[in-house]
Curated annotation (Swiss-Prot):
Family stated for the protein in its record: Belongs to the Tlp family.
Pfam family, one: Tlp
Coiled coil: none
Region (Disordered): 53-75
Signal sequence coordinates: none
The protein, known as: Protein Tlp homolog
Length: 75
C-alpha cells in the first residue's frame, strides 16, 4: 500500500470552515439555552459550548501555525 503524500495546501481553509461551523453551533446552542426551561438541557448545552470555545482557541492557534507554514512553503 502506497502512502499518500502530506498535502497541507487546504488546511487553512478546512480549519476556517471548522471554526465557522463551531461558532454557528455555539450560537444555536445559546438560542436553545434562552428558549428552554429544562435545566438539564441548559446545563448540557452550556457545558458543550464551553468545550466548543476551548476547541475554538485550539483551532485559532492551529490556523495561525498553518498560515505561517503556508507562507513559508511548508518547510
Amino acid at each position: 500500500m502506497k502512502n499518500k503524500p502530506d498535502d497541507r495546501r487546504d488546511n487553512v481553509d478546512k480549519i476556517q470552515y471548522n471554526i465557522t461551523k463551531t461558532i454557528q453551533n455555539c450560537e444555536l446552542a445559546d438560542e436553545m439555552i434562552a428558549k428552554t426551561d429544562d435545566e438539564k438541557t441548559k446545563k448540557t448545552l452550556i457545558e458543550k459550548n464551553e468545550r466548543r470555545r476551548e476547541a475554538l482557541d485550539g483551532m485559532r492557534e492551529e490556523i495561525k501555525d498553518e498560515a505561517r507554514d503556508k507562507k513559508n512553503g511548508y518547510m
